[in-house]
Swiss-Prot record:
Protein family per UniProt: Belongs to the eIF-3 subunit L family.
Name assigned to this protein: Eukaryotic translation initiation factor 3 subunit L
Signal sequence interval, chain numbering: none
Organism: Neurospora crassa (strain ATCC 24698 / 74-OR23-1A / CBS 708.71 / DSM 1257 / FGSC 987)
Gene Ontology cellular component annotations, sorted alphabetically: eukaryotic 43S preinitiation complex; eukaryotic 48S preinitiation complex; eukaryotic translation initiation factor 3 complex
Length: 474
């Protein structure tokens, strides 16, 4: 059993929704059941009141917090979530309630992580500024509020309690998931919370910068249209955004483009049927994903779906052209697009309020790592434009064209040669893949002589005509 399930509610002043108050209600109910014959009417009234209270708390957990909410409200919201999850996880036996709606579980996990993310960013900003003594004092007194450990503990506890990973593994083997669900996992409330907690872990680990672990969490979920997350538009979009971004940061650009392309095509084809608030919430993420595709295509030129290609040209046409040219002029474009499209990274530990200058901005840290990769590949387009003109070429001659030292050029060529080999996911876990050559230009160094070969793939016009005819007459 996880530490969260064994832990008690936070030690701050008890509010009406605290764990202690909830346990008192449960104990009162037990005593009334023992004397059911003497006080049946009182028991029914207590049960009805308790059920109404829980239902209202379930509904409230999915409601977004006001963006301008003060620190006390953020603390209170954290306490409310702790109280609710403590009750769901620690009750004697599963809570026999149905979620208010089919997408309620996603809304709860989504809002829970959003508040954790926004609170962490807010706390870090207050620490860096160091001029609000009152809020700094409050944050010092409550270092574990919206802590990374407690949030991860909730998500892992919900997954463990629902046995959702065992259920998903059974489904992959074409077995009955009910056989391994247990008394908690058989309840829709636990099953849905556990399932979307897996998507939540993908998101949290990405925010913390652990991209490999983020992808590892989805080992038991199949990325296809039949998956449970695909039924909720916001969950569908979020999953592919964070998977694609993790692939991009791991330099698996082909897989990143594949993930981004899938969801963007899906959104473009279903936008006329999606009129709810969940669809409206992904509009900004949609533009961010186009920015990420522009970055990935600049690193690894590839043919895109016509719908995506057209939208990309409309949104980022000028920037994409500069990225594809490469050179120092492309650096500020890469930085601008990354800042626009990256998640709001957070630190796993509270900031240092005593030494504000010692706090590192997580976004700046990951931007620095990303820009190191950009600088390594900065001259790729220029180098390739020369190599395409020859079948063999002297290293010193190419260095003269580029106005760099031969040994520096040799280092670039070796690094970029290695970059053309990438893992490409086909099946199994998202970290797995087949090592393939993702470039149409290959070369080998023999001393100072560069041997170049180019594979040109002709456009499949038949497929192009069929796609456009089907869209015209659909």
């Amino acid at each position: 059993m996880s530490a969260f399930q064994q832990a008690q509610a936070p030690a701050r002043a008890i509010d009406p929704d605290s764990d202690v108050e909830e346990e008192a209600l449960v104990n009162d109910y037990k005593e009334q059941v023992q004397y059911e014959e003497d006080d049946a009417e009182s028991t029914q009234m207590s049960l009805a009141a308790q059920t109404d209270d829980i239902q209202s708390r379930l509904a409230a957990a999915a409601q977004p917090l006001d963006y301008s909410a003060g620190l006390e409200v953020k603390f209170s919201s954290y306490d409310s979530y702790c109280s609710l999850f403590h009750f769901i996880l620690n009750s004697e036996g599963p809570v026999d309630l149905e979620p208010p709606s089919y997408y309620w579980a996603w809304d709860v996990i989504d809002e829970f992580i959003y508040q954790f993310n926004s609170f962490s960013s807010y706390r870090a900003r207050i620490a860096r500024q160091g001029n609000n003594e009152e809020e700094i004092a409050m944050l010092r007194e409550n270092p574990n509020t919206w802590g990374c450990y407690s949030v991860l503990n909730v998500l892992y506890s919900l997954i463990q309690k629902s046995q959702i990973t065992e259920q998903l593994a059974a489904m992959k083997r074409n077995e009955d998931p009910a056989a391994v669900a247990g008394e908690y996992g058989s309840k829709n409330l636990y099953k849905m919370l556990g399932y979307f907690s897996i998507i939540g872990l993908l998101r949290v680990h990405t925010l913390l910068g652990d991209f490999s672990l983020a992808l590892k969490t989805l080992d038991d979920i199949e990325l296809n249209k039949k998956a449970m997350f695909a039924r909720v538009m916001a969950a569908h979009f979020t999953t592919y955004y964070y998977v694609g971004f993790s692939y991009m940061m791991m330099r698996r650009y082909a897989d990143a483009i594949r993930m981004f392309s899938h969801i963007l095509v899906y959104v473009s084809r279903t936008k006329n049927f999606q009129k709810n608030a969940q669809y409206d919430s992904i509009t900004k993420k949609n533009d961010q994903m186009y920015a990420l595709i522009a970055i990935c295509v600049a690193f690894q030129p590839t043919r895109l779906d016509d719908t995506i290609h057209t939208a990309l040209r409309e949104k980022y046409g000028d920037q994409l052209l500069k990225l594809q040219r490469g050179g120092p002029e492309a650096l500020p474009i890469y930085e601008e697009l990354f800042r626009t499209a990256c998640p709001k990274f957070i630190s796993p530990v509270p900031p240092n309020f005593d030494e504000p200058e010692a706090n590192i901005d997580p976004i700046e840290h990951h931007l620095s790592v990303f820009m190191d990769e950009v600088k390594t590949n900065m001259f790729n387009p220029t180098i390739k434009s020369y190599l395409r003109l020859y079948t063999t070429m002297d290293l010193k001659k190419l260095a003269g064209f580029l106005e760099v030292k031969p040994e520096e050029l040799r280092g670039w060529l070796m690094v970029n040669k290695q970059r053309t080999k990438q893992l490409r996911w086909t099946d199994g876990g998202l970290l797995e893949g087949e090592l393939v050559n993702v470039s149409d230009l290959d070369y080998a160094l023999q001393g100072d002589l560069i041997h170049i070969s180019e594979a040109k793939v002709g456009r499949k016009l038949v497929d192009w005509y069929l796609r456009n005819l089907s869209r015209t007459y659909a």
